[in-house]
Every structure is written in structure tokens, then in C-alpha cells.
């Protein structure tokens, strides 16, 4: 409730203490006149009209809404973000109705947001993601700047190994999406660690039942495992074929030597 935005002739300003202190909001927002603003009721995006330079959108201001004076003193504090929804996409058109973005689409990723009261300079700093079983499933770089850092994690498993083929198919370029649930995110900052969490959910706008969605994910994982097993068998066959070729070369050499 203490978060305020102010559009001025020289860009966007924000306050997290009900207007006592103001700071210019940078984040790729230029010093242009902000004439009108609206917060999208579903996506929680801040949409700004400049009436000259176009429209600027700040995706998901949920992390900003949780900022307070006490948080600003924290060494590192995880900020809430909207859940990631598993959607059903097509090849070139996803048929998502008013969920379809016409401008530059936000990256299809889980956003991990955290605040730091000072820039991290010395020592390692990176992010780890753990599933509900406590298994490490992803590691990615972590933002080190003072203020709000927002990192994007693509919640997919690595692409499956596939058998060799002369035909190009894009179906195996991506791994399956991680299962719905709550995932632990951990920032390793020097010799310290800080934990937060993010959520992955089924898209509530889709008509499919939870049972159907779970069946789809189970089938995808079975296909993933089958591809990996097939790739393993293919590699063994290719190895045997190479050995046969080498033996044929050796046998041919022996026959030629014996016939002299």
C-alpha cells in the first residue's frame, strides 16, 4: 500500500514509503514525459503512455509491492513474484486469447527477484534451484548489483539425447517442463546462502482437467526416457558398426598380404 508511482516530464519516479522519499526508476525507462499510467489487473504490469515515444511496460511489479524500509536494510531479501504457469503453446500461434502478447513477449521463464542493500564485489555469487525432493536441478548466474535483481530461470529439463539421424526434427530441442510445485531457490553469496521459493502451476485458463494435465506430463516424461534409452542403444550400435568396419579393414589387409 506504500508503493507509489509518479510520471513526470523527466521519466518515472517511485516511492516505497507512501511518498516520503522518491527515486527515479531507471530499468531501461528513459527520461521521457510519462503522461498516463495503469496497472494491469491480472498481470500486475505497470503500463506507461508517453504520447510521443510509445508505450513502456514494466513486467510484474509484485516484487516492488513488498518493499519496505525494514527490507531495505537486509543484506539479501527474496521478493515475491507471480507464479509461473505451464501453458499450452503451438508452433507459431499459441491461441491464448487475451493472454496473447502482441508486443515483445516476456521471456517464458520463472522470474526470481531479490533485493540487496549493497553491491556484491568479492567472492562467488550464483543461484541454485532445488525441486520438492531436494534435488539440485539448475544453477545460474546471480545479479550482484545494489537494489532489485531479477533473474530468469527456464523451468525445463535439459533436451533429451536422441539417436543419430539424417532427418532434422525440432521436437527434441527442448526438454519437458518441470512439474508443478514449490521450488527452493538459493543464492550462494561468498560463504553465505539465502533461501527463497518460486511456484510453478498449471495454467488456470486452460480447459483441461488436472488429471489430463498430469497424464500429459507423465506421457512426456515416458517419451523423454524412451528417447534417452534409444539414443543409448543407437550409440552402442554405432560403436559396434565402427568396430566391424575396422575389422573389415584389418581382414582386407591380411588377405592382401597373404596373396603376395
Say what each PLM segment does.
Residues 68-260:
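Extracytoplasmic/secretory ectodomains and luminal regions
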Residues 1-101, 107-110, 115:
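Beta-propeller blade termini and top-face loops
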Amino acid at each position: 500500500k506504500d508503493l507509489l508511482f509518479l510520471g513526470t516530464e523527466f521519466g518515472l519516479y517511485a516511492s516505497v514509503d507512501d511518498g516520503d522519499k522518491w527515486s527515479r526508476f531507471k530499468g531501461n525507462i528513459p527520461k521521457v514525459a510519462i503522461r498516463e499510467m495503469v496497472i494491469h489487473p491480472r498481470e500486475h504490469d505497470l503500463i506507461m503512455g508517453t504520447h510521443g515515444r510509445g508505450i513502456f511496460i514494466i513486467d510484474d511489479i509484485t516484487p516492488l509491492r513488498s518493499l519496505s524500509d525494514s527490507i531495505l536494510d537486509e543484506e539479501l531479501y527474496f521478493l515475491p513474484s507471480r507464479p509461473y504457469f505451464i501453458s499450452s503453446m503451438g508452433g507459431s500461434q499459441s491461441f491464448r486469447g487475451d493472454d496473447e502478447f502482441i508486443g515483445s513477449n516476456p521471456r517464458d521463464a520463472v522470474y526470481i527477484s531479490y533485493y540487496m542493500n549493497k553491491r556484491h564485489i568479492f567472492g562467488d555469487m550464483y543461484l541454485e534451484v532445488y525441486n520438492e525432493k531436494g534435488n539440485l536441478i539448475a544453477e545460474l548466474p546471480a545479479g550482484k548489483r545494489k537494489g532489485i535483481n531479477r533473474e530468469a530461470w527456464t523451468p525445463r529439463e535439459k533436451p533429451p539425447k536422441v539417436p543419430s539421424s539424417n532427418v532434422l526434427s525440432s521436437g527434441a530441442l527442448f526438454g519437458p517442463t518441470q512439474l508443478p510445485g514449490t521450488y527452493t531457490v538459493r543464492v550462494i553469496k561468498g560463504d553465505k546462502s539465502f533461501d527463497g521459493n518460486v511456484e510453478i502451476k498449471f495454467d488456470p485458463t486452460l480447459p483441461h482437467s488436472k488429471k489430463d494435465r498430469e497424464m500429459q506430463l507423465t506421457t512426456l516424461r515416458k517419451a523423454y526416457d524412451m528417447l534417452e534409452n534409444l539414443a543409448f542403444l543407437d550409440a552402442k550400435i554405432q560403436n559396434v558398426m565402427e568396430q566391424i568396419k575396422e575389422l573389415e579393414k584389418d581382414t582386407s589387409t591380411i588377405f592382401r598380404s597373404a596373396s603376395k
